[in-house]
């Protein structure tokens, strides 16, 4: 079939070899460049040939898609797809978020990484080099362009339509005309607007957006292709005079050189579009911009046809497009070549793509391995390239890897108008060889809660990936210093809690996006409290209950939440079964005369908990979230009511409630649920309110002797 298509394609090409040639030049302009699609559609519908194409920035994207056989319908479908928004926003599809390797969330604002290059040399990396995370673009440009690069052998003259794009060499202050090599790299360089998208290296030259020096490459069209007629589409303009209070206009004038957007009448026709209200990333306005370009071209069609006498049959164009697309080599990878990693690190990286050396794997395997490697932050960036070998009909996968610096300092916390303010500090060391390892020492300081924790982690790239973690932690709660909110009878609570524990955990991936975790730990807990609200601080001392516990657990965890706190998309789910055994000791603060200490009481119990939180988009701006939580514990009562309640299960769905002691939301068995109506202004701001209901299955009543009673009326909370 391919041979037949090729025969007809060459036959058709022979008839037009000496015919009038038409070149299409597309300017840059960000999302405004979607106008170009409407122009191409109008030209094709009227049988106007497009023999050559040159473009800059967004013009390079549209031009390259057409040059490798995309029809206007194909381009529209691509730009409308959910994938496209993820590509330019840097967000990862939920099914590729490898939760097993993700670090546990921490309240850090800043994570400053550095490395001791020499004995005393520290290299901090604080500011990002681009607004858009390149994690998606590094990979998707392989998916979009590598097969076309393979089909043309790296010669852009051999694409469906011969193509050129422009990038900028800011060091030598000149434009770069890209006519060969990796098509994805060429287009990526041409669109890398400074500070928005990360630049890439081409032949050891850092290449930026081509619009800096040549945003409308008619000169390249004339010099490289010599067409008889040029049709130009201009959706940009030279920067206006900078304004004192407009930082963007100042940057544009510093970065962008003036471009000649005209075409002499003797050479062709130019269509100029002026947009004052379209921003760089307004890709959701595709239909509007497409229609503007389409209608303008139709209005000028008589002028275009008077200059372009040759016509091409639409069926012939579709046939040539089909021939070219059918000859794109399918993705099948075998060998992996890695730059920027030592031999041990290379072995670790290769295990993510295939188990055996020279084993063939697919693009889907590449995609999953790519996101898995970037999930645990051992590697800061991976730039993949697919290099085609025509003899084996396979691709070599070339990976340019940048390892994360070994040391990090973290700073963060929680800022509130209440007394629940927290400061978070942490330091960490990480290293990757045959396996990845990480050591972290961090903690929080606050009026109510204080904590210090040492964590060590080792991840093994076995056939079933396995993670080992060791945690040693010390924390204190002082509930007396809490704020008195949302309660009719909020009496002072002179309670405090100290916790110390060590824990060993083993984690395995579970299903597509979850983690199974097994743990064994030992802890010492100490609760200090007064059983009466009438206290003489000169004489009375707090009662104390101490616990020495050995515990084991198995848990299943999964999350696709889009933020660490106040999420608007995704879900969080936890199912945990725990077994504890240990001893409890009670010491009264003011023992009566003749009091003898009670012996330590042994306790053993089972505890099972489940929690799920999920968010559903109900409209462009409205999201509805919900959560459900349930707890069952077979734990017996402690020596007294207060000790029992301090060790009971706690429903604390909000940041503030986690730092409060509220007996109304404590029980050994309970169910709870909540809804969260959210109005989303943008990615940074939202209005939300949360409503919760809580029902203890067997409420604990403060009687002469502790008793479980029948279920009581529900308690409610709102925030």
Q: What label would you give each PLM region?
A:
Residues 549-682, 687-689, 699:
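C-terminal outer-membrane beta-barrel translocator/porin domains of Gram-negative envelope proteins
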């Amino acid at each position: 079939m391919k041979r037949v298509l090729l025969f007809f394609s060459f036959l058709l090409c022979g008839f037009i070899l000496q015919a009038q040639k038409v070149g299409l030049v597309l300017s840059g302009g960000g999302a405004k460049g979607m106008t170009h699609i409407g122009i191409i559609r109008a030209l094709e519908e009227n049988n106007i040939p497009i023999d050559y194409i040159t473009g800059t920035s967004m013009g390079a994207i549209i031009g390259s898609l057409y040059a490798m056989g995309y029809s206007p319908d194909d381009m529209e479908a691509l730009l409308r797809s959910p994938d496209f928004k993820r590509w330019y926003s840097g967000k990862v599809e939920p099914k590729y978020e490898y939760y097993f390797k993700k670090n546990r969330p921490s309240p850090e604002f800043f994570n400053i990484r550095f490395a001791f290059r020499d004995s005393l040399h520290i290299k901090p990396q604080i500011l990002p080099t681009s607004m858009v995370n390149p994690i998606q673009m590094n990979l998707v440009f392989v998916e979009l362009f590598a097969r076309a690069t393979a089909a043309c052998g790296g010669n852009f003259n051999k694409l469906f339509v011969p193509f050129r794009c422009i990038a900028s060499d800011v060091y030598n202050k000149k434009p770069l005309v890209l006519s060969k090599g990796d098509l994805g790299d060429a287009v990526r360089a041409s669109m890398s607007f400074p500070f928005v998208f990360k630049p890439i290296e081409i032949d050891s030259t850092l290449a930026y957006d081509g619009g800096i020096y040549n945003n409308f490459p008619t000169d390249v069209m004339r010099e490289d292709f010599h067409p008889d007629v040029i049709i130009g589409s201009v959706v940009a303009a030279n920067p206006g005079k900078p304004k004192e209070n407009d930082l963007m206009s100042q940057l544009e004038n510093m970065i962008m050189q003036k471009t000649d957007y005209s075409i002499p009448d003797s050479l062709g026709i130019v269509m100029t579009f002026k947009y004052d209200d379209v921003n760089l990333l307004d890709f959701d306005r595709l239909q509007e911009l497409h229609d503007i370009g389409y209608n303008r071209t139709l209005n000028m069609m008589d002028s275009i046809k008077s200059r372009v006498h040759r016509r091409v049959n639409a069926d012939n164009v579709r046939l040539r497009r089909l021939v070219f697309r059918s000859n794109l080599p399918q993705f099948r990878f075998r060998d992996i070549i890695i730059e920027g990693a030592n031999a041990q690190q290379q072995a670790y990286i290769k295990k993510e793509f295939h188990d055996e050396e020279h084993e063939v794997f697919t693009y889907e395997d590449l995609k999953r391995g790519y996101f898995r490697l970037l999930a645990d932050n051992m590697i800061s960036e991976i730039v993949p390239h697919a290099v085609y070998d025509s003899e084996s009909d396979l691709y070599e996968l070339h990976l340019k890897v940048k390892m994360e610096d070994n040391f990090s300092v973290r700073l963060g916390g929680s800022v509130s108008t209440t007394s629940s303010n927290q400061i978070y500090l942490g330091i960490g060391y990480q290293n990757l060889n045959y396996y990845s390892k990480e050591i972290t020492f961090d903690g929080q300081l606050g009026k109510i809660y204080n904590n210090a924790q040492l964590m060590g982690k080792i991840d093994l790239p076995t056939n079933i990936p396995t993670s080992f973690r060791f945690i040693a932690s010390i924390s204190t709660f002082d509930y007396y210093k809490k704020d008195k909110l949302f309660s009719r009878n909020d009496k002072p609570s002179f309670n405090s809690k100290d916790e110390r524990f060590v824990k060993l955990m083993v984690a395995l991936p579970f299903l597509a996006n979850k983690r199974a975790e097994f743990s064994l730990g030992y802890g010492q807990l100490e609760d200090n409290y007064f059983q009466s609200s009438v206290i003489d601080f000169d004489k009375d001392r707090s009662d104390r209950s101490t616990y020495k516990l050995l515990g084991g657990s198995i848990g299943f965890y999964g999350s696709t939440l889009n933020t660490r706190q106040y999420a608007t998309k995704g879900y969080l789910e936890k199912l945990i079964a725990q077994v504890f055994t240990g001893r409890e000791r009670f010491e009264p603060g003011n023992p009566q005369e003749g009091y003898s200490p009670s012996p330590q009481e042994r306790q053993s119990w089972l505890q099972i908990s489940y929690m799920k939180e999920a968010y559903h988009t109900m409209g462009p701006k409205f999201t509805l979230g919900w959560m459900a939580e349930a707890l069952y514990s077979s734990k017996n009562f402690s020596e007294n009511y207060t000790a029992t309640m301090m060790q009971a299960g706690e429903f604390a769905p909000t940041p503030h409630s986690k730092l409060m002691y509220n007996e109304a939301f404590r029980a050994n068995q309970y169910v709870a649920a909540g809804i969260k109506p959210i109005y989303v202004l943008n990615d940074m701001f939202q209005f939300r309110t949360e409503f919760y209901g809580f029902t203890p299955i067997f409420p604990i009543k403060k009687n002469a002797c502790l008793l479980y009673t029948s279920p009581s009326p529900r308690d409610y909370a709102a925030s």
